[in-house]
Amino acid sequence: AAPLPIAKAIGAIQSHSTSNPTSFAQVGAVQALNGPQDHLDLWLSEFSKRRLVAFDKLNAIEGISCVNAQGAFYLFPNISGTGMKSAEFCERLLAEAKVAAVPGVAFGSDDYIRISYATSMTNIEQALERLAQFVSKL
């Protein structure tokens, strides 16, 4: 446990940052919800393309399988075919291929990793090419 003065200070920061949004933020949120929404179709289309490219490239890698995402901008590929658990896989992937992924153990599933496709198509393609090369050398 933290010393009492530190715990109180952290509690105050947490309280102020997660409750009672300021009035200007509330007005901005209302405008975002009620304002023009035409940009959403463009973003949905772009993220759908990114998701499909990442999904296809992941499933083309021997030892990795992935189901298609239903929301957010993450994929959760199964890496059990590589013979490694998620933390070791992610550590080595970062060190050897310079690709960051989140170990699935943090989400309750040690045979999976989480990757984001909230980046450019170029970055997605480059990262997944590096991931494929990394897995091929295992």
Give residue spans per PLM region.
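PLP-dependent class I/II
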Residues: 1-138
